[in-house]
């Protein structure tokens, strides 16, 4: 009843939100009007139950007014934030206006669509305005910037080449153990790289040595001495032969005994040298040398002849 009285007053008398067009149609400037037309159904003042969509600081909200909150003007409108996703926002409108009239559901969706399109257009215009600042660059300035970029790239390549050459010189030791004008951190970095390279080279050399040892021929000393004639046995045999030959001639026996003693000493010295050589160098091939004299062979032949 009160809504009808308010509409009669607005329609028949004066309303500050109403605008009359030259063609006779009336429009409403109220920010809560869902259609923008001055009609009984779309007037926010003449309807105690009303719903609309409004934009606030770039965000869209669904506003709802009910008679239960008419006595509290500070809490008259209930505001619900709508999702940025278009389909989800439409679902929110349907959920909150489920028991409302079809007119408000349809007009709220229509207003939400229009406001979404307006926001998209505003963003496009803002982007175009920002792009215009970059379009108005003079060709001379553009060429100058391109030349600077090209020169900067060339300078960067030269600097890298110089840095590489200096690093190679530092590693090779061209500047001594530690140059005076080199930062300590850089020097430690270079020394660390050199140590890593040396360790890698040592590992590679060790691997190569292990690989080269495969199939290598080595000569080692034999533990069994059964094949060689014992020196003591040889001395006994020579002593026996000397005793038998002494009965033939005393002069020959004296000379033979002296020569035998000399040969015995030489054989002992050679045997000691051979033993020392084998103990000191076990991994080298062993060579044994035997010394023989002609008069020993002659004595042996004489004994055989007798």
Swiss-Prot record:
GO annotation (BP), single: maturation of LSU-rRNA from tricistronic rRNA transcript (SSU-rRNA, 5.8S rRNA, LSU-rRNA)
Protein name: Protein MAK16
GO CC, one annotated term: nucleolus
Motif Nuclear localization signal location, chain numbering: 139-144, 282-287
Region (7 X 2 AA repeats of S-[DE]): 251-264
Nuclease found in the keyword field: no
Keyword Cell cycle found: yes
Ranges annotated as biased composition (Basic and acidic residues): 234-245
Species lineage: Eukaryota, Fungi, Dikarya, Ascomycota, Saccharomycotina
Compartments, as annotated in UniProt: Nucleus
Stretch list, region 2 X 8 AA repeats: 213-229
InterPro entries from the UniProt entry: Mak16, Ribosomal_eL28/Mak16
Originating gene: MAK16
Family: Belongs to the MAK16 family.
Main location, first listed in the record: nucleus
Bias type Basic residues, positions: 270-284
Compositionally biased spans, kind Acidic residues: 194-233, 251-265
